[in-house]
Amino acid sequence: YVWESGNTPDIYEVNNMDEFRTGEGESTLAACLNRILKLEGAEDINASTELENGKSPAEILTEATGGEGFDLTGCTPEEIRYTISHETPVIAMLSMDHAVLVIGYTDAKYAYLDPADGERHSATPDEMNGLVSGSGNVFIGYVK
């Protein structure tokens, strides 16, 4: 996986990340992917359609960002900090059908956007570990 602890700042938040909600009939995973596509200027790609056509989230991110999408399953919240610190939010699955977008961190808190309620939330490292443990620590990220 992509992680270098020595090269990770202690505090970081991805720029230009406003709250967002799921659209009509849109999954939280598709909403998170579409928010990343908007951030990367690839709004012409619809994540819901791509997922329905059998593409994985990592494949969608690879095609849309000009970088490389990664399935970071098994990483810890601490390990995804490296990816976030490179101005790329990370999708975290809280369950098989509930995705959130992790956009920042400090030593004491993680910041994430939940498209299910349209709100910004924070969680301590222990809370974040608990939130993602139910999905088996499923994270999806990308590098540019």
Describe each PLM feature range.
Residues 1-25, 29-144:
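Conserved active-site-adjacent core of cysteine acyl-enzyme catalytic domains
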